[in-house]
Amino acid sequence: MMVQVPIFDLLKLLDVLGIDSISFRVLNEYDEGFIRVDYLEEALQKDGWSKVYNESEDPNYCCGNFDVEYANNGYKIILRCDEDGYVFQITINKVT
């Protein structure tokens, strides 16, 4: 079942519920990430999110899982990716 919720509606809900952080897995039936990070980055940028950090662009990064962080309106989204660039976990934090 596919559920689509606009990100800002989700942020409002988290705020109303008093939740400062939420994390969820994004996996296919083989327990692998299946959404390319570049697709999510494009969608976030269209919604006005700014890239804060991309671990894979760090000169000290060599291989393995990496994080990409975006920020907007007091929230930070962390996309946890496998070494092939597929997102397998999304974390949303309220920045205080």
Curated annotation (Swiss-Prot):
Top-level taxon of the source organism: Viruses
Biological role: Essential for virus function.
Protein name: Uncharacterized protein E-96
